[in-house]
Design a protein with these regions (language model features):
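Short coil-to-beta microelement around the adenine-binding A-loop and adjacent beta1/P-loop entry
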Residues: 15-16, 73
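Conserved ABC transporter NBD signature motif
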Residues: 25, 57-68, 74-75
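Walker A (P-loop) phosphate-binding loop of ABC-type ATPase nucleotide-binding domains
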Residues: 36-40
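Conserved ABC ATPase "signature" region
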Residues: 99, 103-119
Length: 119
């Protein structure tokens, strides 16, 4: 799955939350958005998932504009993201958390996938 963000902007009234973001996430990559509080990470992810309507700009997933409801529903069934609001158990390691959530969501070949991620 390839995600392409073109000229993405989001305004809340007169406040500019996201300004002219452009990037591509290629199939098979694992990507994170990093930055200080309030810089627009969560807003950007919300727009990528079609949960927040951009003020301008476009999100394409596999060359399909997610503004189209049918495209968005089909595409988002195949996407995953880890919310910044999920509270992970503090006593578990990263690997243990991946196992817990992988089992919860029925991930196939879980141990192999975790091993690859932990390299």
């Amino acid at each position: 799955m390839t995600i392409e963000i073109k000229n993405l902007n989001k305004n809340y009234n007169n406040i500019l939350a996201v300004k002219n973001i452009n990037f591509t996430i290629n199939k098979g990559s694992i990507t994170g958005l990093l930055g200080p509080n309030g810089c627009g990470k969560t807003t950007t992810i919300g727009m990528m998932l079609g949960l927040i309507k951009p003020s301008s700009g476009t999100v394409f997933i596999n060359n399909q504009n997610i503004e189209n409801e049918n495209n968005r529903t089909k595409i988002l069934e195949k996407m995953n993201f880890i919310s910044p609001y999920v509270e992970l158990p503090k006593k578990l390691t990263v690997e243990e958390n991946l196992k817990v959530y992988g089992k919860m969501y029925g991930v196939n070949n879980l141990q192999n996938k975790i091993s690859n991620l932990m390299k």
